[in-house]
Amino acid sequence: MSRPLDGIRILDFTHVLAGPFATRILGDMGADVVKINSIDRATGVNLATHPYFLQFNRNKRSLALDMAQEASRALSRKLCDEADIVINNFSVGVLKRWGIDFDTVAETNAGVIYAEMSGMGDTGPWSKFVTYA
C-alpha cells in the first residue's frame, strides 16, 4: 500500500523535540527522511541508543557529520541539492554559517521547500534567544 509522501526526500537538520517529532510524522507518512546528526552536538538524548532518540527518529536514515569541517558542510549542501524538503530548527544564523540557508540552497535546488522553526522567529527583538522545544 502506498503512503501519501512516498517518493518525497526530506533532509532533516533538527534536534530536541519539535523538529524530530515533525519529521518523524513525515517519515511515518512515507517520506524518505535523512537525519543529519552533528557529532559535535552529541548529548545523551542524541545518541542512537537512547530511547528518546529512538522514539523521535524512527523511520529515518541517519548520517553523523562534523559540521565544524568544510567537507561535512559541502556534503550537506550536496544532499540539499537532492532534497524535496529541507527542515531545521537551529537557532537563527546557524545554517547560514554552514551555507545551508534558503537562499543558498535555492540557487541549486529551485523547487526546494525549506522549513525553519527557530524558537523565536528569524527577526525581531527575541530572535537571538536560544530556545529548546
What is the role of each PLM region?
Residues 1-133:
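N-terminal helix-loop segment corresponding to the beta1-alpha1 unit
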